[in-house]
Amino acid sequence: MKPLTARQQEVFELIKAKIEDTGMPPTRAEIARELGFRSANAAEEHLKALARKQAIEIIPGASRGIRILLQDPVEPEDLGLPLIGQVAAGEPILAQEHVESHYQVDPSMFKPQADFLLRVNGESMKNIGIMDGDLLAVHKTQDVHDGQVVVARVDDDVTVKRLERKGSMVFLHAENEEFAPIQVDLTSQHLSIEGIAVGVIRSTTWM
């Protein structure tokens, strides 16, 4: 049996809690509401994943047709660091559907501690040794300072760049002269910081 992801663990624990409290499992709509999913369909996808991992059984034709099979799932911290792949617009970067896999890397080997890995796409940061295909170790925080290499989301596009702020303007600088800075006007554009880069794992040696 495959271990559960952190998000699957949340769904599993909610199902267990509802059964213990009310004697009945939750509906898809209740799961979506409790865990902040956009729709009951999103909850259904997580239930299907749990069923594939034999943590639950889905009983067709019943809104509360969920039966617990697994009593002691593997804890998510035993999985290692999650590797984030493509990030969908509007979804949290650590949403379960963005997790490609997990890597057995000790988060404490990075300072500050890494929370996830992000697969690097492109050569915009190659001058500081962040290469296409590398796994970037990221500490999840919004407490950032000018000059730090950050993982930023600009209007739902995720990028790795060096941060500079000037009033209402933010400049995201590449470490490659072939790439111009990304300019973000905070009065009209949305910018969110997902974390800071704390290390790199070279894909050719790790994968």
Swiss-Prot record:
GO terms for molecular function: DNA binding; serine-type endopeptidase activity. InterPro entries: LexA, LexA-like, LexA/Signal_pep-like_sf, LexA_DNA-bd_dom, LexA_repressor, Peptidase_S24_LexA, Peptidase_S24_S26A/B/C, WH-like_DNA-bd_sf. Keywords: Autocatalytic cleavage, DNA damage, DNA repair, DNA replication, DNA-binding, Hydrolase, Repressor, SOS response, Transcription, Transcription regulation. The record marks A89, G90 as: Cleavage. CDD domains: S24_LexA-like (cd06529). Its EC number is 3.4.21.88. It comes from the Bacteria. Signal peptide: none annotated. One of its GO terms (biological process) is SOS response. It is an enzyme of class 3 (hydrolase). It catalyses: Hydrolysis of Ala-|-Gly bond in repressor LexA. The active site is at S124, K161. Residues 28-48 bind DNA. Represses a number of genes involved in the response to DNA damage (SOS response), including recA and lexA. In the presence of single-stranded DNA, RecA interacts with LexA causing an autocatalytic cleavage which disrupts the DNA-binding part of LexA, leading to derepression of the SOS regulon and eventually DNA repair. Homodimer. Belongs to the peptidase S24 family. PANTHER family: LEXA REPRESSOR (PTHR33516), LEXA REPRESSOR-RELATED (PTHR33516:SF2). This is LexA repressor. It comes from Aliivibrio salmonicida (strain LFI1238).
